Amino acid sequence: MITTVQEISKWRNLCFIRMQSRKWYPVLKKTPLVADGRKIIKHADKVPHPEEIIHPFYQPTAIEQFTACATEYNPSLLDGKKIAPSLIKHPVSLKTILVDSKLKFDDIRGVNKWLMEFVARRQHQRNIVLTPASKSVRSFHVLHLSSTDIAKLRGLENILSEIENTNDLQSRVESVNNELQNIFDRDSKQTRLFCENILAYLIKNYGNSTEKLILLINVTEMQLYSRLDQMKAMNIILYNILCKVEANENPPYSPTLVTALENLLAAINNRFFPGRCENSLHPIVIEQLLSYFIKTGNLNESKNFLGHLIKKGILPEATIINRYLEAIDVHFDKSTKIFDIRSKFAFIADLAPIIENYGTIDLFKFLIPMCRHFDELCSLLNIIRKSNNAKRAVDSTLPIFIKKVLTFTKDPMINSGNLSTVFNIVSPIYGQNVPSEFVEKFILSFALQGNYTMMAHMIDTYKIKLSHKYQLQIIRALKNSERNHALKNTGAVGYNKEFKKYFIEKYLNCTEREALRP
């Protein structure tokens, strides 16, 4: 029994939580808490609230929901495995952390309510309507400068013409800033010239080199606390700067240019907002910034701007989304490690409405390797099945789905059942006439499971021609099955020696039969 203050202090010191930060989100390192020789249940084992789950496409089917509601003890989704990416509060620091959670309940109480909230949230994401940003640049048109106005800018043009490198940029920035002030001092009463129009004109006509563009970005930053006092003006300037960045350079961008532009964005935030300025930026400018940060490999900012576009009901261009996914793959080196998949989910959590309603083939191909449970794979396949380009998407992704099915378990009977489920989901898309090239892939996958019954059924139903080459592929798959599942299911219907003998005699030529003889 613990009786003294010292003993209590000693006991408390046995309990500890360590934090580890990597990549984007801080992550809870799940070190067991020890007290009185017993392990305390880890906080991450609690079923998260539906709002805390960031999985962008998993949707439990009606059967999964019924099973969870009808199971009295430890009902679960996804077999109760720790694969549901969630943002939860750390139990001690109260900071938001990224963890893989179990969707495993202690008992049946509250499961139905939890499911209703989770499904309602998914339905809300499904109902979000996104529209492409208007490509009208009318908002960014600058006031036409007359020849008289342009003549007033001659001093600025002369300074810009003399710049050759970045070594003397600071002094040139001061010179341009002073000349700007002189222009406004000389013409303060009747001028129609505004600072944003002058800078936009200079960026458009003289920002063709990195050095001059950096100078004009720095001048813009200096003018933030004098004549650039509205976000409308900053939209005009940022639009022209980002157009020039896009036109002038291919990634990787000059580090000096990247620093100058990001310093300007930080200064805009400090000048106009306590936090971030996205709410007052034009959607076209936000999309430009998204594209820019993707190209610079800044995934954190890319995610911020992408999420903001979606929240504003804007559908980013498909090419931008594809580049974002490529940047994620590059950052994580197409890793399938548990931690990296969890982190990748954090970067695509905002894409739920796009996956549901505007998914592209490239997006679906990106998502398939991220599935860690067959039910996730089925959720994704059902989204594709309901999409407007279902047939074209299935044509491009079905071989990847078939291959992925066999990665969740080594049990041949479970794999066979999962293969049959996938086949039943996609076959209506083809009006039950599944192309023979896909049927053949299913047959080979069933061969890898040693399932002679399903192989024979599909060969007969779809009248598959067994060429010499294809028979050899089947034989190799069956041999692999015998090696991998030598002690499993040998007596099960469809897998036993009688079915093997029947299949060999009916479907394989004499020369091929010998290869499978004991």
Swiss-Prot record:
Presequence positions on this chain: 1-19
Amino-acid biosynthesis listed as a keyword: no
GO molecular-function terms, A-Z: translation regulator activity
Localisation: Mitochondrion
Keywords: Mitochondrion, Transit peptide, Translation regulation
Entry coiled-coil feature ranges: none
Keyword Nucleotide-binding: no
Pfam families: AEP1
GO biological process terms on file: regulation of translation
GO annotation, cellular component aspect: mitochondrion
Functional note: Required for translation of the mitochondrial OLI1 transcript encoding subunit 9 of mitochondrial ATP synthase.
Family: Belongs to the AEP1 family.
More about this protein: Present with 504 molecules/cell in log phase SD medium.
Protein name: ATPase expression protein 1, mitochondrial
Organism (species): Saccharomyces cerevisiae (strain ATCC 204508 / S288c) (Baker's yeast)
Lineage: Eukaryota, Fungi, Dikarya, Ascomycota, Saccharomycotina
Gene expressing this chain: AEP1
